[in-house]
């Protein structure tokens, strides 16, 4: 059986979890505590970079969200989450990459902002503008269709759909993109989306954790650099 190492709030793990549900594949969830478990030797033996998700399929192990999504689509093509039409496929890939390369960095920056402050930093303002610009692009690509590939739910929804719905709570409303807002609401009504939905308490805890993550990352980076230096010096 497929095994997914994940954390419920993980921005990277949630699309894989969602794809498994939408494809109606049997799988086992293995929760990982991102408070430090990802840096323990047992986990680093699974992924030397110390992050989720990880997918195990028998003896084969895959890391990185996009690689896992492509693996699932190639290995388990029914139910399909990719169109075969060239234009639709290009649209899906554009949405996936724009969501990860443009929208996700903005979301992460907004999650890290100090929401107790009355004044937005220049970085936060840029993140909001970047998110708004990306939403406008997605609105134009969606057009009047129910999904980015027309009538078929695809990896475009799987990736972008796990980010868009959280933006209003981060200070970026969807009201200027009514088609995208309706699209997001339809996705949230799907059983798979409801299954992965974070409770208000989980979302609040995740936001609080993200605000302290820069300090955690700095500490973990120093620890990792020390461990890597010892590893390479011992191999010389």
Model-inferred region functions:
Residues 1-129, 139, 214, 223-236:
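GST-like domain detector, emphasizing the conserved glutathione-binding G-site
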Residues 20, 192-193:
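Short beta-strand edge/turn micro-motifs at domain boundaries
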Residues 33, 155, 200:
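Short, solvent-exposed turn/loop segments enriched in Gly/Ser/Thr/Pro and often Arg
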Residues 37-39, 184, 204-205:
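Generic structural signal for helix capping and beta-alpha/helix-loop junctions
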Residues 45, 189, 198:
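Phosphate-coordinating loops and pocket residues in cytosolic domains that bind phosphorylated ligands
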Residues 63, 99-191, 233-236:
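GST-like fold's C-terminal all-alpha helical module
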Residues 91-94, 182, 195:
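Short, solvent-exposed alpha-helical surface patches in well-structured domains
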Residues 193-228:
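Terminal-tail/helix-coil boundary detector
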């Amino acid at each position: 059986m497929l095994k997914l190492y994940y954390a419920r709030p993980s921005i990277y793990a949630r699309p894989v979890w969602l794809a498994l549900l939408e494809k109606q594949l049997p799988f086992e969830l293995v929760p990982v505590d991102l408070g430090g478990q990802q840096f323990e030797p047992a986990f680093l033996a699974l992924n030397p970079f110390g992050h989720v998700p990880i997918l195990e399929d028998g003896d084969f192990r895959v890391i990185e969200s996009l690689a896992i999504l492509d693996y699932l689509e190639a290995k388990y093509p029914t139910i399909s989450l990719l169109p075969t039409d060239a234009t639709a496929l290009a649209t899906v890939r554009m949405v996936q990459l724009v969501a990860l390369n443009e929208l996700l960095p903005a979301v992460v920056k907004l999650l890290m902002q100090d929401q107790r402050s009355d004044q937005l930093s220049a970085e936060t303002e840029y993140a909001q503008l970047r998110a708004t610009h990306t939403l406008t692009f997605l609105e134009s690509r969606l057009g009047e269709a129910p999904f980015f590939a027309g009538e078929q739910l695809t990896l475009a929804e799987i990736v972008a759909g796990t980010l868009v719905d959280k933006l209003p709570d981060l200070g970026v409303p969807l009201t200027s993109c009514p088609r995208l807002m309706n699209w997001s609401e339809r996705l949230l009504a799907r059983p798979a989306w409801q299954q992965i939905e974070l409770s208000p308490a989980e979302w609040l805890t995740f936001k609080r954790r993200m605000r302290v993550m820069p300090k955690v990352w700095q500490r973990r980076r120093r620890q990792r650099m020390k461990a890597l230096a010892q590893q390479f010096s011992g191999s010389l």
